[in-house]
From Swiss-Prot:
Keyword terms, alphabetized: Aspartyl protease, ATP-binding, Cytoplasm, DNA integration, DNA recombination, DNA-binding, DNA-directed DNA polymerase, Endonuclease, Hydrolase, Magnesium, Metal-binding, Multifunctional enzyme, Nuclease, Nucleotide-binding, Nucleotidyltransferase, Nucleus, Protease, RNA-binding, RNA-directed DNA polymerase, Transferase, Transposable element, Transposition, Viral release from host cell, Virion maturation, Zinc, Zinc-finger
Low complexity bias locations: 369-381
Protein name (database record): Transposon Ty2-LR1 Gag-Pol polyprotein
Binding-site list for Mg(2+) 1: D667, D732
Taxonomy of the source species: Eukaryota, Fungi, Dikarya, Ascomycota, Saccharomycotina
Length: 1770
């Protein structure tokens, strides 16, 4: 493109600008970039040489090679005029593209108007608008080619030649940007732009104009091509393409940071200390330097630091050099303590000894002023404009300036003076040091002083005058002290102002101090700068910032002076000034010093202590007490800060102007724990500020949507009912109020959200007090009425109604009256919990009662009715049809409604009793409606209470019962919240079994038994319901004629499975009949189906048919426990497989068999019933919960339930029993913490770098870790883990791709020390790995299966290890890591090439790598469905990361695989396994002893012996050993845990550590502990004392049995098949919320290879359902193991499943496809049928006493636990 022409502006002048640049130089601070070439790094010096300017003489010149520069012009060409650039300074487009700045899609050059600079910046060539060096006129431009060779000979670049300015060289590479920017900043400073360049703090002295901005942008663009800029610069410019100043600011900051390390070393090497400053300050300074070096990975040892400090000690501290000279182990803390001791001794010695005032010749250039009241240091500053290049004005030697602004030599950075400044405290005086007036002395010849003039000092912070003649408004000094370099005070007599009257009538005033103790009067440029007055030393004038000359200044000697003629004299009396009470501060210590010395004690405490002589060597009169009472210590304000007390009534002034319902207070209460899901857990309250009217709304959660719905309702209610608009809502700062949703809601409606201030909860007192009042009322009402806790919100609702109607003590009206509502009609209110009878207008039958007992709660909000709670229906209804029971002595008191037992006929009669509610009686909706607070009470299910004995309190035998038992008043009970709505009906039969404790004790402390039998309904069922055949709601018809005969007869009853059992003939006088159950569960064995029988007392009844379809249409006769019930299999091979063949060789206990009909001792077979209601326990829920489970239409009686039939004529007397207030009972609820347990958090067993090496005090261990560290580094380099040929700048890489790295150290079990360099994959960005890739390892079941097959087939077992396995896998992604710490490259990054340990993708990469190698090079195939299990015709391999286990019949086959692996990987043989005697292995934590052809023992004795003592558990190694891990009957208390937060975290961490180790051991081989581990793991977040004690007991048992082993013996060679068996068991409802515990044990050829204990995911409603759930969990794993066994061993396989539930077996083999009880149960049952029939699975019955899976589902007595486990683990 055609080049642009430069227009000359004939009207613009440049003379003034030229004069300013050439003759006026700014006295500026030291340039942080002005570092000599000798101090530059190598690449800086190289770049300096390349871009240097050859020195010139008047006859020669040189111009650097630069395509932007043009040849210099002949001397005849005059300097160009300052005209505008063509097109306002626009660069030609081709030049812009050459610099690649078109990237910003902005104009290449900024348009700018005329910017005046020196004519030396303009060149005659009109084609180039940027400055270039102008050589002398007599020379010509050298050849650029020749210049290229001359650059290397130039030692350092020149910035100026004569009056010409050299532009910066062009940026040549990204790495040289830091060097280039130094020259560019210097170029701008020489271009009169130094005062707009930011310093290292980002500060500028003035704002630049647009022309200057354009000039900076254009020059930067011209000399810095865009493609050569660093990434961080590009990022700044991409945001704002013209923001060059930000780039310069960050550049300066980076250079300062890089130089900090050098400065710290210099400061440390030049430390000096003579006691002139406090020892504490000196220690802080040195420690700060050392800490800063440490942060830069430079560790300064104590020995080196002590040597540097000792070198700088002088005075009384010098002798410490000799003391520490011979010491080898010097501690820095000890040295500081010695220095502090000497410093304190010197203070005491100088207590009454005045120090000599030093001569002025000893003064250094340090001057500060410190007001006593604020203890604030005032250091001198230089505020005048930096627009001159000549040296600044000289400084007075007796008042020196801060060395921060002194010029430092470029070749040497001396920090000693800087360090000495910061080591001192300006206000600090040694004890005994006196301030006295010194005589004026002169450090210069008196002839140098210019009479009647003020010395202009650029370093003084204050103006000082010796005469008070010019001091205006003088006041005696009592605050300011002037301290010299030796910390000696210069007394100040007075403080005042100097008034100046300059030329042109300009007047100004500055602050001045009067003292006669100085050599001459000092005028501070800092004070002048505050008045916008600067000194121009080139023109020798004082000027305003706009250039107005105020007065000339005179140079005399080395100093500049201002005449005193410009001062306006004062008429103050000299006597007033000179008679200042100097004794006021002389010999007195400043109060701030004493305050600090006495530990920042209170003013009154210090003063009183001195009066009482509690502090010696110091008197009260020795301290300056002026302003002491008002002194504010900054450290005290920070350290002793307290919050202000709430100002009572502070909010009232903001609320007086509001009308009723315009200002609301709101707050949320909750949660309330242990409630049914249908009951609310929170409530939100509202209070009107003006009327104090209150509203409450129930909440189930605190979600944004729920809160928003309530606010919408309350605002609409107030608007419609009171015709008012809410303007302000006051609330706290909870997240439910501060969320964006609610904030937007308020904004859209113009409502002001008023939040409480931080830590001022009392400002929210209206809402807080309301909640407290409502809760107090709620607790009182519930306690008084005895209603269950789930009705708590009804109590709150009732309280709100009453509180709105009553007059508070502070008001003269009630809230209703203030709101304009009528008063409360007392006739519409009933006492909370008042017993009532609700009329039933539509019963199912005419003989059904017309009244239902209930309890009045509160008036209805939606009708004129009342909210009534009906315990029998577990519902609340809104009705007016009720009758109040007023006579407490009515005949109803003799009945107990809750303990009634209904027969099946009456159960059918009440089947539809919900339909009795007429139109005026609204059944409560299931949905939560904020307009109807009582709605939440719908479908409240109640939990059953423990039974109360209705019989005589005296001991009775089962056959002697009272005819008219004394019955107790019972309240409504609570049932499981998960039971369907049909279960809320009264149960047809209630269990009424007395409890007798058997005095015979067991090993666990006794067995609790009932003294009555557990009768079942006989097989005589009614046919009354024939009109609905097949209905599951069939009931037993018992009429009033079904009387009990006194005669006895033998009859038979049909069991659930079809087994007929005889009734045992007994004499009895009772009218109650008993029947036989098919199980007699122990207190913790409810899931078992024991074969013991119960005697039956026969009753003469009417036999009728049963229409209920039987599960087993043709059940077998009862067999003894030795026989099993086989499953009918479709496979022909079932003929050869019998129960005996399945049970053979299994490690089952040996039992003494009893006849199933033996009834010699009836009482021993009575089911055990616990008399105490309990919560969730380690052993599960108490049997009483099962026994009281109600029978409903959808829930049949379970096998282990005991029931008593009651004659029909007693029903009408007992059905009204529950009219007395019910008792509140504790529900069986799981603690909220159990729900939060997701998994066991692994405990860190490794050490960090600082723990293993830096701070490791064990030198031997440290040396081993150091050796391991270097070994790991060598391995990483050997594997080419990263690029070693290039380091990347940290700022140039996308942070997402940067992975943090660290070293971890650990000690292996064999004693070796291991170091591992790992990546922090836990904080790896998701974009840097493929989340679909999986890291696979061998399943533990697969390993156990392989070991079992190896034992049975005499396989050789070889153990291998591949060193640094992950590093063999390449990494595909672009990732960077920080280098190891020994390299010291903190700001550099390394490009990863290998899969470093810790990365998310490393495991998957290694798996794919080794899998490919094994398949392609070793001819292996991976077993389908079992990853990391590989096999060929001879060898099986189990792979666990870098560990390999090889199994083969031929050892040479293993060796062949090893040879192939060594070709590619560094493979170590841990154990070849070639010996024939016993071989010991350590495989994946298991300690294995293997004797081929004989046995295999698996244990962890060594590991547990080492790890368990380190858990901080109080082990009892010498005491009596525990014989079981837990005891049945121990229940975990569910009361809320109140604990400190720190203690809670500590205990949770302890639980994680203990359960983590126990879980590891349990799933490895201690399957007998899995139940206890699983139960305690659910309580990790509930670390109560009881839970911890149970955990300690488990750990103690592990310690006592640490030598136990899982014992395997070789299978008999006569066995042609592999036999795989799963034994299943379930414990019904023994977990929180009626969950069941299920367990399975898997055996291969009689060897236990795995076990599992877990809580059922679904809530089972019967024992059979729980057993089916357990079986359904076992079958899939059983099938997968079957496939694995067939792949590893080609023998035929027999699969068996054993369970102790006959009903489960019947359902599995049944072909009946009628509808099941619920879809979950039915789905599982149908699936089991398909899996059993389709997988040749044999299902057999196993006696409960032989079921070894029983240990997986419940705690057992010691005897039973041993019996079930001693065959397979001992």
């Amino acid at each position: 493109m055609e080049s642009q022409q430069l227009h000359q502006n004939p009207h613009s002048l440049h003379g003034s600008a030229y004069a300013s640049v050439t003759s006026k130089e700014v006295p500026s601070n030291q340039d942080p970039l002005a570092v000599s070439a000798s101090n530059l790094p190598e690449f800086d010096r190289d770049s300096t040489k390349v871009n240097s300017q050859q020195e010139t003489t008047p006859g020669t010149s040189a111009v650097p090679e630069n395509h932007h520069h043009v040849s210099p012009q002949p001397a005849s060409v005059p300097p160009p005029q300052n005209g505008q650039y063509q097109q306002h300074g626009m660069m030609t487009p081709n030049k812009a593209m050459a610099s690649n700045w078109a990237h910003y899609q902005q104009p290449s050059m900024m348009t700018c108007s005329h910017y005046q600079t020196s004519p030396a910046y303009y060149q005659p060539d009109p084609h180039y608008p940027l400055p270039q060096y102008i050589p002398p006129l007599s020379t010509s431009s050298p050849d650029p080619i020749d210049l290229k060779n001359q650059h290397s000979e130039i030692p350092q670049a020149k910035t100026k030649v004569g009056n010409n300015v050299l532009p910066p060289h062009t940026l040549t590479s990204e790495e040289n940007f830091s060097t280039w920017v130094k020259f560019y900043i210097r170029f701008l400073k020489n271009s009169n732009l130094g005062d707009i360049i930011p310093n290292d703090q980002g500060e500028i002295k003035r704002q630049m104009t647009y022309e200057e901005h354009a000039y900076i942008y254009n020059t930067f663009q011209a000399f810095a091509p865009f493609h050569l800029l660093p990434t961080w610069v590009k990022q700044i410019l991409e945001i704002n393409y013209a923001d060059i100043l930000t780039v310069l600011c960050k550049s300066v900051s980076k250079m300062q940071t890089n130089n900090q390390e050098l400065k710290d070393w210099i400061a440390l090497a030049n430390l000096e200390y003579d006691g002139s400053t406090s020892a504490d300050t000196f220690e802080i300074t040195v420690s700060t330097i050392i800490q800063r070096l440490k942060e830069n990975n430079i560790n300064v040892s104590d020995r080196l630091a002590c040597q540097l400090i000792l070198k700088g000690l002088s005075g009384d501290f010098k002798y410490l050099r000799n003391q520490y000279r011979t010491k080898t182990n010097m501690k820095l803390s000890q040295l500081f303590a010695e220095i502090q001791l000497i410093y304190d001794e010197n203070k005491i010695m100088n207590l009454n000894k005045p120090s000599q005032y030093k001569q002025h010749s000893e003064y250094k250039n340090v001057s500060r002023t410190s007001p006593n009241t604020t203890n604030t240091k005032v250091t001198t500053r230089n505020y005048h404009r930096t627009n001159s290049s000549k040296p600044r004005a000289a400084k007075a030697h007796n008042i020196a300036t801060s060395s921060k602004f002194s010029r430092v030599n470029n070749d040497h950075i001396n920090e000693s003076t800087v360090s000495s400044q910061y080591l001192s405290d300006d206000n600090e005086l040694s004890l005994g040091q006196q301030q006295k007036e010194s005589k004026p002395t002169h450090t210069i010849d008196s002839n140098d002083e210019l009479p009647d003039h003020l010395l202009i000092d650029s370093g003084a912070s204050q103006t000082l005058v010796r005469s008070a003649h010019y001091l205006h408004h003088a006041t005696p000094n009592s605050e300011i002290n002037i301290v010299d370099a030796q910390k000696q005070d210069i007394p100040i007599n007075a403080i005042g102002n100097l008034h100046f009257n300059f030329q042109n009538g300009t007047k100004t005033s500055i602050k001045a101090l009067h003292t006669p103790n100085i050599a001459y009067d000092l005028l501070s440029l800092s004070e002048l700068a505050n008045q916008n007055i600067t000194a121009c030393f080139t023109r020798n004038t004082l000027e305003r910032s706009d250039g107005t000359v105020l007065a000339p200044i005179v140079k005399h000697g080395d100093f500049y002076w201002l005449s005193k003629k410009y001062l306006i004299p004062s008429h103050i009396s000299k006597l007033t000034i000179n008679n200042v009470n100097k004794s006021k501060s002389v010999n007195k210590y400043p109060y701030p010093l004493i305050h600090r010395m006495l530990g920042h004690a209170n003013f009154r405490s210090i003063q009183k202590s001195l009066k009482k002589n509690a502090v010696t060597y110091l008197k009260e009169s020795d301290i300056e007490w002026s302003n002491a009472s008002t002194y504010q210590c900054p450290d005290c304000l920070i350290g002793k800060s307290t919050k202000h007390r709430h100002v009572k009534g502070s909010r009232l002034k903001y609320q007086e102007s509001y009308e009723p319902f315009q200002y609301l207070h709101t707050d949320i209460f909750g949660p309330v724990h242990h409630l049914p899901k249908s009951a609310p857990s929170y409530f939100i309250s509202f209070t009107d500020e003006k009327t104090r009217f209150q509203w409450v709304y129930p909440l189930h959660d605190r979600r944004e949507e729920s809160i928003l719905n309530v606010f919408t309702s309350i605002l609409a209610f107030i608007k419609n009912q009171f015709n008012a608009r809410v303007l302000v809502i006051q609330m706290d700062r909870g997240s439910e109020y501060t969320n964006k949703t609610l904030h937007k809601f308020f904004t859209n409606r113009g409502i002001t959200a008023c939040y409480t201030t931080t830590a001022d909860s009392r400002a929210h007192g209206v809402a807080e007090r309301l909640n407290r009042t409502l809760l107090n009322d709620c607790r009182t009402l519930l306690h008084c009425s005895g209603l269950p806790n789930h009705l708590w919100f009804s109590a709150v609702e009732f309280s709100t109604i009453i509180r709105n109607s009553l007059v508070s003590p502070k008001n003269d009206k009630s809230a209703r009256q203030h709101a304009g509502l009528a008063g409360l009609d007392i006739t519409t209110i009933l006492p909370f919990g008042q017993p009532v009878i609700v009329n039933n207008h539509n019963p199912d039958s005419k003989i059904h009662p017309r009244g239902i007992p209930g309890y009045a709660l509160h008036p209805s909000r939606n009708s004129y009715g009342y909210i009534i709670y009906l315990p029998s229906l577990k519902k609340t209804v809104d009705t007016t049809n009720y009758v109040i029971l007023q006579d407490n002595q009515s005949k109803l008191d003799q009945f107990n409604y809750d303990t009634l037992t209904f027969d099946d006929d009456l159960n059918r009669l009440t089947a539809h009793n919900q339909s009795f509610i007429e139109q005026n009686e609204t059944e409560q909706s299931y949905d939560q409606n904020t307009e109807s607070d009582h709605d939440y009470q719908s479908e409240i299910e109640i939990n059953s209470d423990p039974l109360v004995n209705d019989f005589s309190s005296q001991s009775m035998n089962p056959l002697q019962l009272d005819h008219e038992p004394v019955q107790k008043v019972r309240a409504p009970k609570e049932v499981d919240a998960d039971i369907s709505e049909y279960n809320i009906l009264p149960s047809p039969v209630r269990s009424r079994t007395p409890h007798i404790i058997n005095k015979e004790s067991t090993e666990m402390g006794g067995t609790i038994e009932s003294d009555t039998t557990s009768p079942r309904h006989s097989s005589t069922f009614t046919a009354r319901n024939q009109k609905r055949p097949g209905s599951p709601n069939d009931m037993i018809d018992l009429t009033s004629q079904d009387r009990v005969n006194y005669g006895l007869e033998n009859i038979k009853t049909t069991r659930l499975g079809g087994t007929e059992e005889p009734y045992i003939q007994r004499n009895s006088d009772t009218n109650i009949k008993y029947r036989t159950t098919n199980s007699t569960p122990s207190i913790d064995d409810r899931s078992s189906n024991s074969e013991s029988t119960t005697p039956i007392i026969s009753i003469e009844t009417k036999a009728v048919c049963d229409n209920t379809p039987s599960i087993d249409t043709d059940p077998p006769e009862y067999r003894s426990s030795d026989h099993a019930t086989p499953n009918i299999m479709p496979d022909k091979s079932s003929k050869n497989v019998t129960a005996d063949s399945i049970l053979d060789d299994l490690p089952l206990p040996d039992l003494t068999h009893k006849s199933p009909t033996d009834t010699s001792d009836v009482s021993k077979d009575i089911p055990h019933i616990h008399s105490r209601q309990t919560n969730s326990s380690l052993g599960g829920m108490d049997d009483s919960n099962v026994l009281t489970t109600t029978k409903s239409k959808k829930r049949s009686l379970e096998d282990n339930e005991t029931e008593i039939e009651v004659s029909r004529d007693t029903w009408n007397n007992k059905n009204m029993r529950s009219l007395e207030p019910p008792r509140s009972k504790k529900r069986i609820n799981l603690i909220a913490a159990i729900k939060g347990v997701k998994s066991i958090k692994p405990v860190r067993t490794t050490l960090r770098y600082d723990e293993a090496i830096t701070y490791n005090k064990d030198n031997k261990e440290k040396d081993r870790y150091v050796e391991a560290y270097h070994k790991e580094i060598s391995q990483l380099l050997k594997m080419n883990t990263w690029d070693t040929n290039k380091y990347y700048d940290r700022n140039d890489i996308d942070p997402k791709k940067v992975i943090n790295s660290m070293f971890i150290f650990n000690k292996k079990r064999d004693g070796t020390h291991k170091a591992r360099f790992v990546a922090r994959g836990d904080i790896q960005h998701p974009d840097t790995y493929d989340s679909d890739m999986q890291s696979n390892t061998v399943h533990h079941y697969a390993l156990m299966t392989s070991l079992s097959i190896a034992l049975d087939n005499d396989y050789y077992i070889t153990q291998l290890d591949i060193s640094s396995a992950y590093l063999y896998a390449d990494i595909k992604e672009e990732l960077y890591i920080r280098p190891p710490p020994h390299l010291g490259l903190n700001d550099k990054l390394l490009r990863l090439r290998k899969s470093l340990y810790g990365l998310k993708q490393s495991g998957a990469n290694w798996y794919e790598t080794i899998k490919s190698y094994l398949i392609n090079c070793c001819d292996m195939q991976e077993v389908r469905g079992w990853s990391c299990v590989f096999k060929n015709s001879q060898v099986t391999i189990c792979l666990f990361v870098d560990d390999m286990i090889l199994f083969s019949k031929d050892l040479n086959a293993n060796k062949k695989i090893i040879t192939t692996l060594k070709k590619q990987y560094d493979t170590k043989i841990i154990n070849l396994g070639e010996r024939d005697n016993e071989i010991q292995y350590d495989i994946l934590g298991l300690e294995i002893k293997y004797q081929r052809s004989k046995y295999m023992k698996l244990g962890m004795e060594k590991s547990l012996t080492e790890k368990l003592p380190k858990l901080n558990v109080p082990l009892n190694p010498k005491g009596k050993k525990l014989r079981a891990p837990g005891q049945p009957g121990h229940y975990i208390d569910q009361d809320e845990l109140e604990i400190d937060e720190d203690e809670y975290k500590e205990k949770v961490h302890e639980m994680q550590k203990l359960i983590g180790l126990a879980s590891y051991v349990g799933y490895k081989f201690r399957f007998d502990l899995l139940y206890y581990i699983n139960t305690l793991a659910q309580h990790i977040l509930f670390p109560s004392r009881q839970v911890l004690d149970m955990t300690y007991e488990l750990i103690q048992f592990m310690w006592d049995t640490r030598d136990k082993q899982l014992i395997w013996h070789k299978n008999k060679p006569t066995k042609p098949d592999n036999k795989l068996v799963a034994i299943s068991d379930a414990s019904y409802g023994n977990q929180p919320y009626y969950k069941s515990q299920i367990g399975n044990i898997f055996l291969l050829n009689g060897k236990v290879i795995g076990g599992k204990s877990t809580k059922a995911s679904l809530t089972c409603t019967s024992t059979t359902e729980a057993e089916i759930h357990a079986v359904s969990e076992a079958i899939p794993l059983l099938n997968n193991l079957s496939h694995l066994v067939q792949e590893l061993n080609k023998k035929p396989i027999i699969k068996g499943l054993l369970t102790d539930s006959r009903s489960t077996i019947s359902i599995i083999k049944s072909t009946n496809e009628e509808k099941f009880r619920n879809r979950f149960f039915g789905t599982k049952a149908m699936r089991l049928r398909d899996e059993v029939s389709g997988n040749n699975l044999y299902v057999y019955y196993i006696e409960t006493k032989k079921n070894i899976a029983d240990v997986m589902t419940k705690p057992l007595p010691i005897k039973t636990f041993k019996l079930l486990t001693n065959k397979w683990i001992h």
